[in-house]
Amino acid sequence: KEKYRVVYTDHQRLELEKEFHCNRYITIRRKSELAVNLGLSERQVKSWFQNRRAKERKII
């Protein structure tokens, strides 16, 4: 099975960044809400948050 890279739209990135700014760790309920609102899977939202936290650690 080949893995493909998700390209997020500007709107999706903006909403995810806003959520991350409020809380670095997303709740299960909020993850579900964001996934539905942004047209993403919960796994994609979870992965985005994991990657964003890793990016933050790398910068520091």
From Swiss-Prot:
An example Gene Ontology cellular component term from the record?
nucleus
Q: Where does the protein end up?
A: Nucleus
State the similarity comment: Belongs to the Caudal homeobox family.
Say if the entry is tagged with keyword Nucleus: yes
Q: Which UniProt keywords apply?
A: Developmental protein, DNA-binding, Homeobox, Nucleus
- Put simply, this protein is called Homeobox protein CHOX-CAD2
InterPro entries per UniProt: Caudal_homeobox, HD, HD_metazoa, Homeobox_CS, Homeodomain-like_sf, HTH_motif
Annotated GO MF terms: DNA binding; DNA-binding transcription factor activity, RNA polymerase II-specific
Give the species: Gallus gallus
Q: Which Pfam family is one of this chain's hits?
A: Homeodomain
Which ranges does the entry annotate as DNA-binding region?
A: 1-60
Question: Matching SUPFAM superfamilies, A to Z?
Answer: Homeodomain-like
- PROSITE patterns with a match to the protein in the record: HOMEOBOX_1, HOMEOBOX_2
